[in-house]
Design a protein with these regions (language model features):
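Interfacial segments at transmembrane-helix termini and the short loops linking adjacent helices
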Residues: 36, 101-117, 300-329
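Hydrophobic alpha-helical transmembrane segments
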Residues: 111-118, 144-193, 356, 360, ...
């Protein structure tokens, strides 16, 4: 995987830059809004994100499954943005309609706040489909720039609003929605995706194929975000504000792991199915090592800085991060498993693990939130994520013939990893007093 080093480094830089700006933005929001205000903003964004994640019809999974047929690649590319805008518009309209229906129930945000958030859904859908194609085309530098400029635009808007005294729940939501337009503009202008007349027949076939996977995709999203809806309904915006900040900080642990998964995605589609299984196992072993290092670093860093940065009102966030990080890292390290199962075009083995984990998550949240609030929510999430990965590992082993122990790094691999980390630290003079 030596040829992956330049794109890995660039994507890592892009994700790190995005992360820094995201943290800066979250500090600005936390200092301007109390936990209740952050909870209201995040619920509006969560509704829009739900429209994206439940309404995308799993087209990006269908794109991945069809990419191995080289004759379809050009049309899949040209279809990505128009299809995303069309599907996204339908999803946004449906989300606003449901928002109207549930006004006054379950602490649902104001309808105009929901309309503002959902205005970003069509562009967000175009970004979702377009980014997947960009990565499949091995143009990781474009995906990185799109990610970086989007975060920069959102962060700049929040800083300007803060300086001018215009920062409010509505302007925070508006900045979030507008950031998708920046990302989509970069993807198209920089050649990540091609804008030309779409192939309507293939677009229809892609949607139909995606629907075969969509129950699993919907369950996977609800696995990640149903906890926010349940926490909002059972505990209220204050707990949502603290919990969602913890989720944002816990996801720092995904940085290196997600980047490595993105830049190695094309490797899983280069060879025969048998070779792909071996490559997948090698990728996962390295991602486990990255994940453990990232988890420890994240928990220690958050414990040290959360109160000075965000204020005493968010002090409980550090405890929630410690409960969330193991599940978040495990979920990220398992991404190559999903890609392998998608390549095998076995919709059942993609759908069933997500549905099972969702049932576990909802059941545990319903039981634990009334007793333990946000802490119970974090515990339920980590247990559910673990159950998802366990099922995916079982299906991978059955499909490929590779045992689950082969997905764990060996002692020699761990030694090489730690030696390399120490060498890099010495080069940076880390840990020296002078």
């Amino acid at each position: 995987m030596a040829d992956r080093k330049p794109p890995f480094v660039w994507m890592l830089v892009a994700r790190a830059g995005t992360l820094v700006m995201g943290i800066l933005a979250s500090v600005v929001v936390a200092r301007a809004l109390p936990p209740e205000g952050r909870g209201t903003y995040y619920m509006a964004v969560t509704v829009a994100t739900a429209a994206l994640s439940l309404g995308h019809l799993s087209v990006e999974q269908a794109q991945t499954a069809l990419w191995s047929e080289k004759g379809h690649r050009s049309s899949l590319d040209s279809n990505s943005v128009p299809l995303g805008l069309g599907v996204g518009t339908a999803a946004a309209v449906a989300a606003v309609g449901l928002g109207l229906l549930f006004q006054g129930h379950g602490n649902m945000p104001d309808i105009w706040l929901l309309v503002t958030a959902c205005a970003g859904v069509p562009m967000g859908m175009g970004v979702l489909y377009g980014t997947n194609i960009t990565l499949l085309r091995d143009r990781t530098h474009v995906a990185g720039w799109a990610m970086l400029t989007s975060a920069a635009a959102q962060c700049l808007c929040l800083i300007v609003f803060g300086v001018t005294g215009l920062l409010s729940v509505w302007t925070v939501v508006a900045a979030w929605a507008a950031s998708y337009a920046v990302s989509l503009g970069v993807l198209t202008a920089a050649g990540g995706v091609t804008v030309r007349r779409p192939d309507l027949r293939l677009a229809r076939a892609t949607c139909l194929k995606g629907l075969r996977f969509h129950a699993g995709s919907a369950a996977a999203y609800l696995l990640l975000r149903s906890d926010v809806f349940l926490l909002n309904a059972l505990a209220g915006p204050h707990d949502v504000g603290i919990y969602t900040l913890a989720v944002t900080l816990a996801e720092m642990s995904r940085l290196a792991v997600d980047v490595f998964a993105q830049v190695t995605l094309s490797l899983q589609f280069d060879d025969t199915a048998g070779d792909s299984a071996v490559v997948t196992a090698r990728i996962i072993r390295f991602m486990v090592l990255l994940g453990v290092a990232s988890a420890v670093t994240t928990v220690v860093a958050v414990s040290a800085v959360v109160t000075p940065l965000y204020g005493q009102a968010y002090a409980d966030t550090a405890t929630l991060v410690a409960w969330l990080v193991p599940g978040v890292v495990l979920l990220s390290a398992g991404r190559p498993l999903s890609s392998f199962l998608l390549r095998a075009r076995m919709s059942r083995v993609v759908v069933l693990p997500s549905l099972t984990a969702l049932v576990v998550n909802v059941g545990l949240n319903a039981a634990l939130i009334p007793a333990w609030g946000a802490v119970g929510c974090a515990i339920a999430s980590t247990v559910a994520y673990t159950s998802l990965i366990a099922l995916q590992v079982a299906y991978f082993s059955r499909t490929s013939g590779i045992g689950w122990r082969c997905l764990l790094p060996t002692g020699a691999e761990a030694t090489r990893f730690t030696t390399e980390v120490k060498r890099r630290c010495r080069q940076l003079h880390l840990g020296r007093a002078a």
